[in-house]
Swiss-Prot record:
The EC number(s) this enzyme carries: 2.7.7.60, 4.6.1.12
Organism listed in the record: Bradyrhizobium diazoefficiens (strain JCM 10833 / BCRC 13528 / IAM 13628 / NBRC 14792 / USDA 110)
Protein name listed in UniProt: Bifunctional enzyme IspD/IspF
GO BP of this protein: isopentenyl diphosphate biosynthetic process, methylerythritol 4-phosphate pathway; terpenoid biosynthetic process
Gene name of this polypeptide: ispDF
Residues annotated as binding a divalent metal cation: D241, H243, H275
Region (2-C-methyl-D-erythritol 4-phosphate cytidylyltransferase): 1-234
């Protein structure tokens, strides 16, 4: 592809996804621990040849969209229309001010689009002007009539399954969409069909069987199982932290402000529960400890909320393609009493970590009045974290 080609993406995410079952629009449901739309958008956002990603969303989904794609670079979302075709046109019109050379049009419900497919889409549009990814049909296809009886068996060798991203010269597909809208044509099921109607020759390029569209509840179950099977490297880490009491009227424990007659002596907010948990996660990653990532000698972390330390550790797991399986913290103290706040702390850890509360445990014990915790001079915490990473044979000893 010539370096002068500017490529943008229309990410279509305005549908309601009713066939996917309960749980809201399918593009905002999680798959493999991440929202479907996040996975789709991230693939394009990180691609070196894509300069703009234009999301098209349902106006009722604004809050869900913002939460689902937090941290990803994209254009301000534009509202979709009553049909997919109308939504694509809205996305193209929103991109017109950027004057891209190439545009890729992708369904947000396809979260497993690869860098290779994206690169092939850009290259194909640059060479041909209009192209779509396809995969061969492996089953025998039957054409049936109104009676349900078989009327014909088409030649499987000529059949292909169309996928997205479908790629086009921007000016050509924008004009085709505008013409279709002007002529009152709203029955096209994909952008290639509009291009064909407009008289364009649509080329094909190699798609990817993994780049499937999530449509039914069974699709989600199957893909969750596939992703879980890929995360065969199960690791566990442990952490420990302690802080002495000082002056104050509260302490931070597991992300929760707890009223107390004393405060913590600490460089940050002194949240021993979260500090131990961060060390456990970093330990599972073999990625140093909290002090190496957030040195107490750095004034930047003076009084810092420990929420950001835990978010950082969770992001390190995600960067390795992993998922958190379980988080557990045990608080060791006489006071304050942890029991009444246990579920509040679990919920807060789950919220910070982006995991279900069923994967978070908070326990409490005492040292039977022994040692510094028994004398109520401070609080200690131990933690464990279990994570799953993609299996990499090269990291295993022979």
């Amino acid at each position: 592809m010539a370096k002068s080609q500017r490529t943008a993406v229309v990410l279509v995410a305005a549908g309601r996804g009713l066939r996917a079952g309960a749980g809201g629009p399918k593009q905002y449901r999680e798959i493999g621990g991440q929202p479907v739309i996040y996975r789709a958008m991230e693939a394009f956002s990180r691609h070196p040849d894509v300069f703009a990603v234009q999301p098209v969303v349902n106006p009722d989904d604004s809050a869900m969209f913002t939460a689902a794609v937090a941290g990803l670079k994209h254009e301000p979302p534009t509202n979709g229309g009553a049909t997919r075709q109308a939504s694509v046109l809205a996305g193209l019109e929103a991109l017109a001010k950027h004057q891209p050379d190439i545009v890729l049009i992708h369904d947000a419900a396809r979260p497993f689009v690869s860098d290779g497919v994206i690169s092939r889409a850009i290259d194909a549009a640059s060479r041909t002007g209009a192209a779509i990814p396809v995969v061969p049909v492996t089953d025998t296809i039957k054409l049936t009539g109104a009676s349900g009886n078989v009327e014909d068996t088409p030649d499987r060798a000529r059949l292909r399954i169309a996928q997205t991203p479908q790629s086009f010269r921007f000016d050509v597909i924008l004009e085709a969409h505008r013409r279709a809208a002007k002529d009152g044509r709203s029955d096209f099921t994909d952008d290639a069909a509009i291009a064909e109607w407009a008289g364009l020759t649509v080329a094909t390029f190699e798609g990817d069987v993994a780049n499937m569209k999530l449509t039914t509840p069974e699709d989600f179950v199957r893909e969750e199982a596939r992703l879980a099977a890929q995360l065969g490297d199960i690791r566990t880490g442990t952490g420990y932290d302690v802080h002495a009491f000082g002056e104050g009227d509260h302490v931070m424990i597991c992300g929760v402000r707890v009223p107390h007659s004393k405060g913590f002596l600490a460089h940050s907010d002194g949240d021993v529960g979260l500090h131990a948990l961060v060390d456990a996660i970093l330990g599972a990653l073999a990625d140093g400890d909290i002090g190496s990532h957030f040195p107490p000698s750095d004034a930047k972390w003076k009084g810092a909320s420990s929420d950001q330390f835990l978010k950082y550790a969770i992001e390190r797991v995600a960067q390795r393609g992993g998922r958190v399986a379980n988080l557990e913290v045990t608080m060791i103290c006489e006071r304050p009493k942890i029991g009444p706040l246990r579920d509040t702390m679990r919920a807060r850890i789950a919220e910070i970590s982006g995991v279900d509360i069923s994967r978070v445990a908070v326990k409490a014990t005492t040292s039977e009045r022994l040692g510094f915790t028994g004398r109520e001079e401070g609080i200690a915490a131990t933690a464990s974290a279990t994570i799953r990473l993609p299996f990499n044979e090269k990291t295993w000893s022979v």
